[in-house]
């Protein structure tokens, strides 16, 4: 069974109604990211940060996976599918995908502010799945009973799952990049770890930096339309 690795970004969830962070109508156009998505912002104004993510979490509850998510889940019957997502939503999982690695965290989870250690990184023992409920800025948890924070990788923070993501890409037979402009590092360089002979596809209606790489197939369509074409293109690669 061929190993299909997927690197997904906000574009795959946009058709479900999840607003992207970047782009002409992105969230960062409404709220400066340095006021919301940095460790300093969390310390300076925890209420604003928690309210921002509470609002996103409540919106997530009312959106559904779209056809692109569902096709990827269905492809697990024919391929060893591993998804590396930059998205913090849970739409891949709700569509039925089993192997999903979140690079930038998860909206439906929180963790204590003191659960990071130099030896273990983020201790998953203290990460809590809260579903879609709102979290107050003064809620506490963990062994130190410290304030809870969104289980989100903020700007200026390390990406704990990066090494796992690189290892996954290095073992790929087919690499699909969908819904990401490849502007956010270190995720933007993951495709460079694809092994020799790996077939690389991009689904993005706009130009992509990776699209200029020799041998890359660029499907210039939105996620749902592009996934239909992609599934057909690789149907003979099993």
Q: What label would you give each PLM region?
A:
Residues 1-238:
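Conserved catalytic core of sirtuin-type NAD+-dependent deacylases
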């Amino acid at each position: 069974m061929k190993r299909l690795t997927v690197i997904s970004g906000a574009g795959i969830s946009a058709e479900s109604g999840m607003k992207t962070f970047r782009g002409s109508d992105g969230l960062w156009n409404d709220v400066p990211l340095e006021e919301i998505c940095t460790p300093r912002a969390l310390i300076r104004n925890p209420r604003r940060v928690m309210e921002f993510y509470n609002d996103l979490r409540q919106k997530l509850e009312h959106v559904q996976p779209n056809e692109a998510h569902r096709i990827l889940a269905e492809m697990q019957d024919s391929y060893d599918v591993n998804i590396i997502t930059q998205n913090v939503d849970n739409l891949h999982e709700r569509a039925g995908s089993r192997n999903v690695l979140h690079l930038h965290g998860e909206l439906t989870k929180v963790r204590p502010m003191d659960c990071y250690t130099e030896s273990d990184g983020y201790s998953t023992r203290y990460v809590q799945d809260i579903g879609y409920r709102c979290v107050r800025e003064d809620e506490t948890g963990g062994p130190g009973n410290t304030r809870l924070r969104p289980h989100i990788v903020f700007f200026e923070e390390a990406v704990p799952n990066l090494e796992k993501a690189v290892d996954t890409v290095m073992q790929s037979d087919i690499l699909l990049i969908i819904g990401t402009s490849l502007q956010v590092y270190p995720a933007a360089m993951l495709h460079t770890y694809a092994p020799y002979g790996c077939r690389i596809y991009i689904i993005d209606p706009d130009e992509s930096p990776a699209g200029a790489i020799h041998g890359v197939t660029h499907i210039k369509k939105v996620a749902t339309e592009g996934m239909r074409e992609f599934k057909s293109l690789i149907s003979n690669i099993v």
